[in-house]
A protein has these predicted regions:
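Well-ordered alpha-helical segments embedded in enzymatic catalytic cores
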Residues: 90, 118, 142, 190-196, ...
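Short, ordered loop/turn segments at secondary-structure junctions
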Residues: 42, 134-136, 161-164, 186-189, ...
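P-loop NTPase switch/communication element
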Residues: 150-197
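P-loop NTP-binding catalytic core
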Residues: 57-58, 69-129, 169
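P-loop NTPase nucleotide-binding module
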Residues: 108, 119-164
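Residue-level signature of catalytic and energy-coupling elements of molecular machines
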Residues: 37, 91, 160
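N-terminal accessory targeting/assembly segments
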Residues: 1-87
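Conserved P-loop NTPase nucleotide-binding/switch module
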Residues: 202-203, 207-247
Length: 247
């Protein structure tokens, strides 16, 4: 079995934090299990780890600290998500009704090589596969590694709606290997990019981070039978489903 290798570019995420909060994260000395950093205006900052959530400091987050992170973050998309170029980290904003950012979730993105060993026979079967699971259990990590492995011998195109598979910026993260990546201007246009990927770029495999709308399911059905699709969907019941179409 392939040994797992993890890269996370964590310093790039810590660099956007105010220095006092960065030092608090580093003082926790548990970076390998760090999942998210939570900054909400008027509340104490916290860090979420695999097994616990801790308070980083007793001082409440100020407007200046929210603005500090906001100014060092890439532009937020229509879904209030942003990233850091050439990394897999995701920064999500909470806004008030006037549009000002009042909360931030900084999620650590990790490339984990070797994660698909247990299902490699499934992803190489030539069938379309839908991966089901709760948010945060590693569905995107599996898709990213599957795209890298399949791209060694097949034409793979990733439809990367939130830039979580290939990372932020115009150049995809090395973790996707030779797979090509198409970005999506707005989440509601994902189904159009799915169709465009098949019609314009002749893939043997398409990889979609999440299929959650009826139009996206319909777009998956229009793909020729020779094109297999790997995708994920949020659910409370983890599973892997073979499917001739996404239902």
């Amino acid at each position: 079995m392939t040994q797992h290798r993890i890269t996370d570019d964590l310093d790039a995420l810590l660099d956007v934090l105010p220095i006092n909060i960065r030092h608090a994260v580093e003082k926790a000395n548990n970076s390998e299990k760090l999942l998210e950093i939570i900054l909400d205006l008027g509340r104490v900052p916290t860090a979420r780890f695999v097994e616990e959530e801790i308070v980083l400091q007793e001082k409440e987050i100020t407007r200046a600290e929210i603005d500090y992170v906001d100014e060092r973050t890439g532009e937020f998309d229509a879904d209030n998500r942003a990233g850091i170029e050439r990394t897999l980290h995701r920064i999500s904003a909470i806004r008030n009704r006037r549009g000002a950012v009042v909360g931030l979730t900084l999620r650590v993105g990790r490339a984990v090589y070797g994660t698909v060993d247990i299902i490699q026979d499934i992803i190489e079967s030539g069938k379309s596969v839908l991966i089901l699971g709760r948010p945060g259990v590693g569905k995107t990590t599996l898709l990213r590694e599957a795209a890298r492995i399949l791209a060694e011998n097949k034409r793979v195109v990733i439809v990367d709606t939130s830039n979580e598979i290939g990372g932020d910026g115009d150049v995809p993260h090395p973790a996707v290997g030779r797979a090509r990546r198409m970005q999506v201007r707005e989440p509601m246009l994902q189904h159009e990019v799915m169709i465009e990927a098949v019609e314009n770029h002749n893939p043997e495999v398409t990889v979609i981070d999440e299929i959650g709308r009826e139009l996206e399911a319909a777009a998956a059905r229009t793909s020729p039978s020779a094109v297999c699709s790997l995708s994920a969907r949020h659910t409370d019941k983890p599973s892997i489903i073979f499917c001739s179409t996404q239902r």
